Amino acid sequence: MGPHSWLPLFMQLALLGPQWALHFYKVKVFVVPHSHMDVGWLHTVQESMQVYVPDVYNSVVEALTRGKRRRFIAVEQEYFRLWWDGFASAKRKQQVRQLLAEQRLEFVLGGQVMHDEAVTHFDDQILQLTEGHGFLYETFGIRPQFSWQVDPFGASATTPTLLALAGFNGHIISRIDYDLKDTMQHTQGLQFVWRGSRSLEARQEIFTHVLDQYSYCSDGFMWNGSPRFPDRPFDMDYSAVEMPVSQDSMNHYVLNLVDNVNKRAAWFRTQHVLWPWGCDRQFFNASQQFANMDRLMDHINKHTPELGISMQYATLAEYFQAVFAQDVSWQVRDHRDFLPYSSAPEQTWTGFYTSQSGLKRLARRASALLYAGESLFTRYMLSAAHRFLDPAWALTQLQQLRWAVSEVQHHDGITGTHILAVRDMFVEHLTTGMAGVRKLMDSIAQDMPLTHSGPEPGGHVAMVYNPLAWTVTTVITLTVSFPEVSVTDESGRPVLAQVQDSKETPSAYDLHVLTTIPGLSYQHYIIKPIRKAREDSQEAAATVPSTIQFGLKLRRQDGQVGRNLVPVKNSCYTVFLDKDTNLMHSIWERQSNRTVRMSQEFLAYRSVYGYEEAVTSDNYLFTPNGTAEPAWAAVRMEVVEGQLLSEIRQYFYRQANDSDHTYAIYSRLAHGPQDSAGELLCHRIEQEYRVGPLELNHEVVLRTSTSLNTGLVLYSDNNGYQMQRRTYRHDRNNSVSLNYYPMAQSAFIQDGGSRLVLLSEQAHGVSSQGNGQVEVMLHRRLWNKLEWTLQYNLTHDVTSVVRPVLWLLLGPRTLTTGLRQRSGLELQHRPVVLFRELGGTVQNGPGPRKQEPVTLPPSLHLQILSIPGWKYSSNHTVHLKNLQKGHYRRAKADFRRVLLRLHHLYEAGEHQALSRPVTLNLQSVLRGLGSVVAVEERSLTGTWDVNSLHRWSWKTEDGHHHRGSSRRPLPPLRGPNVTIHPKEIRTFFIHFQEQ
C-alpha cells in the first residue's frame, strides 16, 4: 500500500473522534493467542480428540517454531496430557520443551479443566489444579503463575484465594453482571487487587483483570474456519470464516482493529491493552491464523506514528509484567464475589445451580469416595506389612478417579450445561473411577485384621471406615433383605441397631447401626440374620420401631393449623407435626428453649414454554413465569419411633387421587449418646427427599417457612470455603431469579435469637423470597423451541427421580457457629462401609496392625492425606537437572512422601474459642501413621517450596504494598511444629521412615 492509498484510512481513523485522539501514539496491544477447548459441552472429550484437539497442538507448535515472535497460551491440561501421552511425536515433544524454555508457549491456570466457580466445592477445585500442576511440574519443571478463568458463569471469591495460595501473580475473569461490567468499564475499574478472604486479607491478595465486553473472543479476526464434527476433513480443507489479510482487505482490518483497541484502551488505567486472540475450538490450523495476523501486525507496526498503536504477540506473563511495571496504585476489592451472573436484562444464570441434579450428586459422592480412598491407601502403605496389594495398581485406581472428579469440575460439566451425550461421558468416567477405588478399598479391607469367633457360618462383615480426622458418632444405614437381624462388634458384643421397613423398597429393610469411630480408623461389625427356628438363640436382635400412620390430608388454604400437634423428639429437638395438615408445624430447640414456627412444602416454578422469541429457563437460565405455586394436592404421613432414631415420612401427591407420590420428605432425629461425642448427631435433623418425575417446564423447590425475622437476608457459601451475606435485590421483572445463589455446601437464615442452617451434600440453588423463608431448588425439567436448544439438542428434558439430602441445624448463633462446619464435613464425608462374606470362625493372620487414630483439634480439618505418586524431586534445582538429563523416564513413584493439607475451618472472630490459631506438632499428630522424618511446607498444589515462593507485590490505594506469599509471613518452618491461623490452608510434604 503506497502513501497515497494510506490517506483514506487515516481520514477514517480521524473521524473516530476524541477517543482515538486520546490514545494517539500511546497504546501498546498485547495479542494473546489462545484456543478455548471445553472439556465436554457440545461434544465429548473423545469426539474433540478425534476432530480437532491434536491439530491445535500440532499446528500451534509448528507455527511457533517457524516464527520467533509468535506466542500461545494453553489452558486445559486434560486435553494437553491426552495429546502429549497419545499423539505427540518425539520431535513435537522436543519442540514443546524448547518453546517453554524460550517462554513463547505458556501454560496458564494449569488445571485439568477451567473449573466452574459457582457449584464446585473448593476441595475439588484444589484437586483439579493439583492434578494439572503436578503433571506440568513433573514433565517440564514449570509452574503456572497466571489464571485464565474466562468462561465460568460468575466469579467466586474463593478461586482468587486458592490461586494466591498456589503462587499465582495474576488472575483473569470475564463473566460478571453485564451492568456491573459496563459501570466498571466507564470508571476504569476492570483491574483491581482482590482480597478474596476476609480472614487472610492482604496476605493472599491477587491482582485481577476482568476482560471487557468483548470477552475472550476476537470476532472478525479468525481465519481457520470451524472444526467439522463428527469427522475432521481428510484433506484438512476448512473453509475460512474471514477473508484473508491482503492489500485489498488491509484497510478493513486495520480500521476495525484500531477502533476496537481504542475503545478498550479507554476502559483501563494503563495504555497496555490485553487483546485475546482466539475463541472456541480455534487454532487447529495455526499456520493460517498466524500468517494473516503477521501481515496485519506488520502493517500496523509500520504505521504506528499514524495509528497511535503498536502490536506484539504476548503470553499472559508478558502482559502482566508490563502492567506490573507501571506506577499505579490499584483499587482493592474485598471478599465479595461476582454471583449471580446476568448476561442481559432478565437473563440471570441461576438455573445451572441445580441443572442435572443427579450428576451433581454423583460428582460430590465420587469426590467423597476418593477422599476416603486416598487416606485409607496412605495408612495401608505406611503400615508394617501389606500382603495382597500391588501399589502401582492401587495408584492407578486412585489416579483414574482423581482425573474423573477433576474433569467434571469443568464449567460445562458439573454445571449441567452440556448435551446428554456429554453427561453420559461424565457419568461413565465417574462410575468407572469409583468402581476402581471401591475395589481398592475392598482389597485393603480384606487385609485388615479381624478376629471373630461365631457359632456358625453366615452373614457379613461390615468394615466401617471414618475418613475424617476426629472421632465421629453417627448412624449408618444399610439395606438388608431380612427383618430379624443381629449386629455385633468383632468381639461379639451387641451393637445398638434398629431395623424397619424400607422407606422406598417394599421388599427390603433399612438397618440403622450406631457407630463411634476414631479419626482415620475403622470398626468391624458382624451382621447376621436371626433364625426363628432356634428358640434357644441368645443373639441380640436389632430393635424394631413402632409406626403410626396418618391418613391422606388435602392441602388446606384456610390457615387453621396448630390445633392437633404430634411431638417427635430427641435430646436436642422436638419437632411438632400438625395432624390436620400432615405438615411440620414448629421445632423446639433445647439450648435456647425457643420454639420456632417452621413448615415445609414443595412448590414449582413454571417457565415460558415453546416461544422462540421468549427468554425462557434452560440449562443455564432460570426465568420463571411468575411466583412458585404448590406442587402437591395431598400429603400422607408416617411416624416411625425407635430406640435409635425416629423418622418422619411425608408423602406428597401431585393430585389427590394419584396412586403414587411424586415428592417425599424423610426426616430423622437420632437418639445417640448424651455426651460430647454425640453432640453433632443430636443437633441435626437429617432430611432426604424424593423428587420426580416432574411435569415438563417445572422447576421444583423445597420451601421452609419460619417465624424468624430475617429481613430477607440470606447467607450462602462460596464453594464450601466461606460465607457470603446476600441482601434481597428488588427488580421489576427479575426479582425471583436475581435472588438465587449457589449453595455448594451450606446456607442459613437468622434473627437475633436463632439461626436455621441448611447443609447439603451437593450443589443447589438457594434463595430467600420472603421474610423468614429459605428455599432450595431440587430438580428441573425443561424444554423449549429456541434455535440454540434444537440445533445442539441442549435440552434438560429429564424424567429422572432425584434424592437429595439436607441436614437442618437450629439454635442460637453461638451453637450453630460451632457446629456448622464440622456437621457439613460429616455430611460430605460420611463413613464408608465395605462388606465381605463371613464364613464361620475368622482369625486373620498378622496383617496390618490396628492403627492408632489420627485426631486433629475441632477447628482443623484434614483436607487431604494422600500419596500422590509424583516422581519429581522436592528440590527444584535437582528436579530441573533430572529433567535435563532425562532421568524422569527412570524415576519411580515415592510411596513414603505424603501430601498433607490442613484447613482452619473458622473465620477470624467468628467463634470465641474455635477462631483462635492452632499450634500442633505434626510428628505427634501423625504418629499413628508412622515415624515422620521430614516436613516440607509447599504451595497449595505442592509445586513450590514456600521458602522460595515470592509473589509480586502490587501497590494499592489503601497504602498497602505487601509482598504476597502463600502463607502468613512467619519464620521458615523448623521442625514439626506448625501454627494454623483462621481460614488458612497449609500444604505439606510429609516424609515417613521406611518400615
Swiss-Prot record:
Concerning InterPro entries, the annotation shows: Gal_mutarotase_sf_dom, Glyco_hydro/deAcase_b/a-brl, Glyco_hydro_38_C, Glyco_hydro_38_cen, Glyco_hydro_38_cen_sf, Glyco_hydro_38_N, Glyco_hydro_38_N_sf, Glyco_hydro_57/38_cen_sf
Species per Swiss-Prot/TrEMBL record: Sus scrofa
What does the record note about the cofactor?
Answer: Binds 1 zinc ion per subunit.
Q: Which gene encodes it?
A: MAN2B2
- Record-stated family: Belongs to the glycosyl hydrolase 38 family.
Where in the cell does this protein reside? Secreted
Active site residues of this protein: D151 (nucleophile)
Q: What does this protein do?
A: Can digest both p-nitro-phenyl-alpha-D-mannoside and high mannose oligosaccharide (Man(8)-GlcNAc(2)). May be involved in sperm maturation. Has a possible role in specific sperm-egg interaction since sperm surface mannosidase acts like a receptor for mannose-containing oligosaccharides located on the zona pellucida.
What are the entry keywords?
Answer: Glycoprotein, Glycosidase, Hydrolase, Metal-binding, Secreted, Signal, Zinc
Question: This protein is called what?
Answer: Epididymis-specific alpha-mannosidase
The known PTMs are summarized as: Processed into a 27 kDa fragment localized on the equatorial segment and the apical rim of the head of mature sperm.
